[in-house]
Structures are given as C-alpha cells and as structure tokens.
C-alpha cells in the first residue's frame, strides 16, 4: 500500500554476488533448502541486503527476522550478518517442512499467498538460469509511495520517516 512517507532506512551496496551465492549454496547443503529460494527471499526482503532498517513489524537483517525467531534459528549468529541470516532462513524453512511442503514453509516465513508466489517465481527464474541472479542483483531499490514509485539510491539514509514531497523536492526524479 502506498505511503506518504519514505522509510527510515539506509541503502548500502549489497555484499558481492559471489559471496551471497557461496552462502546460499553452503546453506543449501546444510539445510536442504534450495539456493534459489534463499536468494529469492533475500531479494524480496532487502534487495540482497542493501536495504538496512527494521521493518514496520520490527524484523531485522538481510533476511528480515524478528529477533526472537532469529534467536531460535540463528545458532548464536549475528542477525545483521548476511551469512548468518541466510543460514537462519534455511534452518527456519527446514524446520517448517520445506523438504515436503515448500509452500507451507514459505507461508510460515511470511504469511501471505502473494509472498509465497513471488518467492517461488523468482526462485524458478534463478534455478532455470543461474545468471538471472546477476540481473536481479543490479536492480535499483524503489519504494511505493503516494507520489508513485520513488528510487532510493545507494547512499539514501533516513533516521526517521521522510515526507515523500520533501524528499522529492530535494531529490527530483
């Protein structure tokens, strides 16, 4: 739903795609959750970790975990670490039956049918052509606002929500 303010986020360059791929593949071997599903979640949640900031619900880190959930599945890791967060996502999905019912596990991760479809669609695209991750990786970050889609470039930083009009006046698009 479009909002009249831009979020209290920081947009940083994501980790190198090679590092992310290594983390996805390592976790696939450990948890049985396909690398492309882990990558799709990372893309949807934080554009591969470039979006830094808590969600409106309080979720944190590259894979957007609630701190209590991360504590249960993160094996003592750092919620803000891409590798630790990806590992926790694999652990969470595996514990929620990904091997037998991926859609159920994905729904437990984010209880929205549209989310499950989006993860599956992006995962299928990356599984069919692993080079697709490079294309997704290079996407810009846009935020849906009442003024339309607003580009949030690398370097965007807001400590608190910013009225869209104020931001666009200072950063015409």
Predicted features along the sequence, with ranges:
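Catalytic glycan-binding domains that act on GlcNAc-containing polysaccharides
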Residues: 1-150
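Extended ligand-binding clefts on enzyme/binding-domain cores
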Residues: 146-163
């Amino acid at each position: 739903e479009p909002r009249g303010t831009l979020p209290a986020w920081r947009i940083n360059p994501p980790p190198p795609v090679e590092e992310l791929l290594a983390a996805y593949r390592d976790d696939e071997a450990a948890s049985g959750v396909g690398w492309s599903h882990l990558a799709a979640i990372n893309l949807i949640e934080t554009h591969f970790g470039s979006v830094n900031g808590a969600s409106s619900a309080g979720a944190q880190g590259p894979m957007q975990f609630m701190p209590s959930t991360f504590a249960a599945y993160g094996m003592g890791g750092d919620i803000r670490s891409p590798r630790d967060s990806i590992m926790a996502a694999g652990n969470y999905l595996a514990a929620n039956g990904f091997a037998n019912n991926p859609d159920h596990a994905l729904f437990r991760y984010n209880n929205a049918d549209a989310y499950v479809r989006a993860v599956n669609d992006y995962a299928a695209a990356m599984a069919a052509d692993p080079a697709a991750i490079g294309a997704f990786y290079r996407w810009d970050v846009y935020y849906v606002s009442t003024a339309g889609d607003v580009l949030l470039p690398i370097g965007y930083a807001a400590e608190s929500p910013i009225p869209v009009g104020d931001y666009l006046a200072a950063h015409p698009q």
